Amino acid sequence: MSDIAIIVSLLSLVAVLGLWIGHIKIKGVGLGIGGVLFGGIIISHCTHLYGIELDAHTLHFIQEFGLILFVYSIGIQVGPGFFASLRQSGLKLNGFAVMIVGLSGILVALIHKLFDVPLPVILGIFSGAVTNTPSLGAGQQVLTELGGDNITAVMGMSYAIAYPFGIIGILLSMWLIRIIFKVNIDKEAQEFDNNQNQQKEGLDTLNVRLTNPNLGGLKLKEIPDFESHTVIYSRLKRNDQLIVPNVDTVLNVGDVLHLVGEKATLHKMQLILGEEADVSVSTRGTIFRSERAVVTNENVFGKKIRHLMLKGKYEVVISRLNRAGVELIPNGEMALQFGDVLNLVGRQEDIETVRAIIGDAHQKLQQVQMLPIFLGIGLGVLLGSLPLYLPGFPVALKLGLAGGPLVVALILARIGSIGKLYWFMPPSANLALREIGIVLFLSVVGLKAGANFLDTLLSPEGLAWMGYGAIITFIPLIVTGFVARIYGKMNYLSLCGLLSGAMTDPPALAFANEIKDGHGAAALSYATVYPLVMFLRIILPQLLAILLWTAS
């Protein structure tokens, strides 16, 4: 067999064995994707015994390419919600997540100095202790540029030794906080639901009868606050006739308007217009329909709603716009993006015409545009390669192959589309790309680390590494957990999601979700902190490597 055939065969064997190991669960907890690392270690141990040599350059390429695929697909997945998570309710959650990341970085520096742990070893322990694989890749890359020898193997070993307690430590932290604070799970779930219902600002509807005589005879666009675009006037009922109003529709006293907007805004408009009307303005039984359509036509990407002139040409109103699961109040200045779901109100034939304009081709939501993917990856690699020179630093700071594609993916996913290019990926395609990338990366890390793993694990040095990893895992989690619970008054279920997200650990999230079956509190806080934490976990090992290298 050729060298390439041998490597591909072994990688496939590692993936099969590792994924099988990852699916083994004890008390509902398993290694998950981390099992691939241990599959690589086992196969590497066997190849070492039989004297099989693998080409280092080929392995290095596969490792780096896998990492690029993984971080890029993560960025595309979380990009739409990344910047939103930094605002409003996400501020507190992200603040505590930053606290966990910061404490772990401080502990790394202290252990490195106090116990004289080699830099490659402590960075590998750090990545394993926080169960973050891209962190390992970022650390390996910057240490290689600093001129270290045998970096990949040493970091891979220390990562693998610290990894198991990285998972166990999160679960232990959740359990201890629950015991110490005597948490009642049902009560916590109820309090979370009550709080969410109070804070929720979804769109509501209200039927208002126009009784203000000062507004009779005015056009719709002339009524107060119309230009603020905070309310949509989707239907108008005059006597028994239902019509779709446009900006030039003249209002009569007694007209019933169907308004869409936030509850507080609707109440304000009711005070201006008149009184709430207990009248049905349903399209059922009329010539009008209310239907949903998806924006998939590349010719309308980036176009403002007012440029489509839907009201003027087709007498169709967009009453709601759903973007990435968030309901928005559409206005004329809002630009359409691929995947936007529009709620259309109008005659059936007019709605069909509008459907043809915006696309509404649901099969496109399952198709993958390959050009934007490789364009994004290329831009990410270029960004990651740009050096930032700082005085006193021995090497330039770089985002690297882990950080560059992540940052570019976050930005492109937030933008959504440029011209006919769109950066939407179906969830199934994104998951496949992400899993292939991480499997390739962990397989190679395991193959490089496995030759001496067992000897190191059973040595006093290996036991010390496990201890250091336990400290880096446990102390930031338990300290932040106590602070968040006592001073932040954080809900326990949200806190469990925060701890899982701060360690970017899906197995821990699965455990947190099972604390209260069918409840979404943990998943919500996990998703809120995940994007920022992933970015910090990639940047922090590079900063630590350069700072500690410079100080030594």
Curated annotation (Swiss-Prot):
Stored SUPFAM superfamilies: TrkA C-terminal domain-like
Gene3D superfamilies associated with the record: Regulator of K+ conductance, C-terminal domain
Gene Ontology terms for molecular function: monoatomic cation transmembrane transporter activity
PROSITE patterns: RCK_C
This protein's UniProt keywords: Cell membrane, Membrane, Repeat, Transmembrane, Transmembrane helix, Transport
Predominant cellular place of this UniProt entry's protein: membrane
One GO BP: potassium ion transport
TM segment ranges: 4-24, 29-49, 65-85, 95-115, 161-181, 370-390, 403-425, 438-458, 463-483, 492-512, 529-549
One GO CC term on file: plasma membrane
Topology of the protein relative to the lipid bilayer: Multi-pass membrane protein
Location of the protein in the cell: Cell membrane
Record bears the keyword Cell membrane: yes
Domain spans labelled RCK C-terminal: 190-275, 277-360
PANTHER family per the UniProt record, alphabetical: K(+)_H(+) ANTIPORTER SUBUNIT KHTT, TRANSPORT PROTEIN YIDE-RELATED
Family of the protein in this entry: Belongs to the AAE transporter (TC 2.A.81) family. YidE subfamily.
Protein name, as recorded: Putative transport protein APJL_0985
Provenance organism: Actinobacillus pleuropneumoniae serotype 3 (strain JL03)
Lineage summary: Bacteria, Pseudomonadati, Pseudomonadota, Gammaproteobacteria, Pasteurellales
